[in-house]
Amino acid sequence: MTTIPKIESFASDLTAIRQDFHAHPELGFEEVRTSGIVAAQLRAYGVDEVHEGIGGTGVVGLINGQGGGNRRVGLRADMDALPIEETSGVAYASTNPGRMHACGHDGHTTMLLGAARYLAETRDFDGTVVLIFQPAEEGLGGARRMIAEGL
């Protein structure tokens, strides 16, 4: 498997973030802690613009490439958990009773944070990357609400 050394250099940070998200799952439109961490990480990575509260608890970041240009591409991840009791027994199991990241959204959010960090540090592209961290994907209309609020 081919890997990117720059991403390998912060892979352990991403693992810690994912395990933290997994241990603290939040249901749709309740992703206050998660969205706060996402926004703080984006700012720490040097993302050009960070907008919070889009669609309730959604976060949108913009990274401008070094090549300029008007083209845009959107990358999206969902942040919400499911109303399920976790019984996995892993060290980073849910600490919120009746809530679990059983659908991988903790991983999706972390992967997009990893992409954000890499893109913000390298900026080896033209145009703008729009990072969309969506709340309430599990049937609650988080995407519709983000669009209605200007995404």
Features from the language model and the residues they span:
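Acidic/histidine-rich catalytic neighborhood of metal-dependent amide-processing enzymes
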Residues: 107-151
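Membrane-interface loop-to-helix entry segments
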Residues: 103-105
